């Protein structure tokens, strides 16, 4: 299994709902066996620059992850979120 995690922050806090809605589009892509988009609770006060959103997904294999990233809804989500985001950090790991 491949676990995929993305962290995002908004340039402008007023765009938070638009970013959340744009990321939520990804839930309609059929290739993930588990998919979540959530807002960061920001309870850890050690970090100075916390992400605003987390995307977490699990895929059965690399082919499923590749198909997810090639899906038209993935591209639609990027077109909405990219202009509004400040930071994006992504990680893929075996689980």
Please tell me what each predicted stretch does.
Residues 58-94:
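C-terminal structural segments of small proteins and small subunits
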């Amino acid at each position: 299994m491949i676990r995929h995690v993305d962290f995002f922050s908004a340039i402008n806090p007023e765009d938070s709902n638009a970013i959340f809605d744009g990321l939520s589009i990804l839930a309609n892509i059929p290739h993930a066996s588990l998919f979540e988009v959530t807002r960061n609770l920001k309870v850890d006060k050690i970090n100075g620059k916390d992400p605003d959103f987390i995307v977490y997904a699990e895929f059965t294999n690399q082919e499923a992850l590749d198909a997810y990233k090639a899906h038209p809804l993935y591209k639609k989500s990027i077109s909405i979120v990219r202009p509004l985001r400040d930071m994006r950090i992504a990680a893929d790991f075996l689980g």
